[in-house]
């Protein structure tokens, strides 16, 4: 890496200004202190953290922490526009990721899906040279390959996101946010941001590898080096799958074991009576899940099952019996931020609620006892999208509430069961799932 580029990147990092969002307004150190909030910046190893102490004597809403740098004429990072590339990481597997250049606009989204594709959809801009990323953002000099990557290496409590603005001379604005989503910050309480780190490397790939290694170490990532090999019902039968379809394929794979040495048979969406009532099958699966798992095992395969654990359909027994377990609106009734087939509305289980955590532990413990060794958890991002809703725990962020629910799922399913996360915010899954 050239001394010039390295010194410019060091200037960017050292010039970051720390801010805190209190009741929907951003404050620097001095303005925060004047209002009774002690904001401090520190290093955690090679990472940066911000801490706020509420000394105001009143409860407030904590929007998050921000590191910011700006300077027109490429004042943040001077790399000529024709050489500068921005790598954008997506929030989930269904969010776009890739490289943008000066003159481009951000990736386009279906407006109806935007709230499931971005942590902060209200900040999306289709203007040229305005870009947003989740988890990590990188700046590359495509002439030399040299790269600076900014990424959050912890992610259990808050969502990490980024934005930047380019001009013809380079990066004019850069922002990294550790999002607290309006969680309660009580008088006398302290909250610490997630850890923000920077990685300079001779290539984007090298920077990504260093970031991933550090992120995985800090979050105790689970390591499985042999990917599971199996058959999934979704990609042929979709939601029309029947019990006899599963049995037919089990027999076929048993007869062709040498040609197709699979380990798992996964039943996907289509068996459940309603979202939320996962142990009760519809009429297409007359013998039930326990019986089916036993039939799969007798044939020499491991049973696997699809669920969307945070989603609860409006016609489910779970919603009728426990509406208070859902994320609540201002009238203390369930929010319905999503929809399902045949016009059914979907409420979202509140992962911050201890009763929901107990429900998850019991559900996944039962599935394991019934013989399922693998679960695919789908539509997981819905567990973080609450709109105007509020959590049982007012101090929980969206990220923390989601992870609490996922921790309970892991506890119930056991350390040796394989959990696949699907359409989930990557950061909050690290350390709890085996694949994504």
What are these regions (language model features)?
Residues 3-160:
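Polysaccharide-binding surfaces and accessory modules of carbohydrate-active proteins
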Residues 59, 201, 205, 239-247, ...:
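Generic detection of long, well-ordered alpha-helical segments
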Residues 49-53, 194, 230-232, 302-306:
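Residues within well-ordered beta-strands of beta-sheet-rich folds
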Residues 259-436:
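Aromatic- and carboxylate-enriched substrate-binding clefts and catalytic-loop regions
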Residues 113-227:
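Beta-strand-rich recognition/accessory modules
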Residues 6-7, 134-135, 176-179, 249-251, ...:
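Short alpha-helical segments and helix-capping/turn motifs at coil-helix boundaries
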Residues 44-46, 55-58, 144, 255-261, ...:
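Short, solvent-exposed loop/edge-beta patches enriched in aromatic
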Residues 208-264, 268-273:
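An acidic-aromatic substrate-binding cleft motif
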């Amino acid at each position: 890496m050239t001394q010039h580029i390295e010194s410019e990147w060091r200037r960017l990092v050292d010039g970051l200004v720390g801010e805190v969002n209190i009741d929907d307004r951003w404050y620097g150190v001095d303005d925060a202190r004047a209002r009774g909030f002690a904001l401090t910046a520190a290093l955690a190893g090679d990472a940066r953290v911000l801490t706020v102490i509420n000394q105001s004597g009143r409860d407030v809403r904590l929007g998050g922490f921000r590191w910011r740098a700006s300077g027109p004429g490429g004042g943040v990072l001077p790399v000529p526009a024709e050489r500068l590339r921005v790598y954008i990481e997506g929030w989930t597997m269904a969010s776009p990721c890739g490289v943008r250049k000066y003159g481009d606009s951000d990736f386009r989204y279906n407006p109806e899906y935007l709230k499931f594709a971005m942590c902060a959809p209200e900040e999306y801009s289709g203007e040229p040279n305005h870009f947003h990323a989740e988890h990590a953002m990188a700046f590359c000099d495509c002439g030399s390959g040299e790269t600076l990557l900014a990424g959050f290496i912890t992610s259990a409590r808050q969502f990490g996101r980024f934005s930047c603005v380019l001009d013809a001379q380079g990066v004019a604005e850069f922002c990294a946010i550790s999002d607290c989503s309006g969680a309660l910050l009580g008088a006398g309480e302290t909250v610490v941001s997630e850890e923000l780190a920077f990685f300079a490397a001779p290539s984007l790939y090298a920077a990504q590898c260093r970031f991933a290694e550090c992120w995985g170490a800090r979050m105790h990532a689970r390591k499985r080096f042999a990917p599971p090999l199996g058959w999934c019902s979704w990609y042929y039968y979709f939601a029309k799958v029947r019990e006899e379809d599963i049995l037919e394929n089990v027999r076929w794979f048993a007869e062709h074991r040498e040609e197709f040495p699979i380990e798992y048979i996964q039943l996907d969406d289509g068996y459940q009576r309603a979202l939320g009532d996962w142990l009760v099958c519809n009429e297409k699966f007359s013998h039930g899940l326990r019986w089916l798992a036993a039939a799969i095992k007798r044939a020499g395969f491991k049973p696997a099952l699809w669920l969307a654990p945070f989603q609860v359909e409006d016609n489910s027994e779970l919603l009728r019996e426990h509406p208070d377990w859902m994320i609540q609106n201002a009238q203390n009734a369930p929010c319905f931020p999503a929809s399902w087939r045949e016009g059914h509305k979907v409420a979202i289980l509140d992962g911050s609620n201890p009763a929901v955590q107990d429900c998850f532990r019991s559900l996944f413990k039962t599935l394991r006892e019934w013989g399922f060794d693998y679960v695919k958890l789908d539509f997981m991002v819905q567990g973080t999208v609450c709109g105007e809703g509020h959590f049982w725990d007012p101090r929980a962020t969206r990220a923390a509430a989601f992870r609490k629910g996922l921790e309970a799922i892991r506890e119930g399913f056991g350390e040796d069961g394989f959990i696949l996360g699907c359409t989930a915010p990557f950061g909050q899954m690290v350390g709890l799932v085996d694949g994504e």
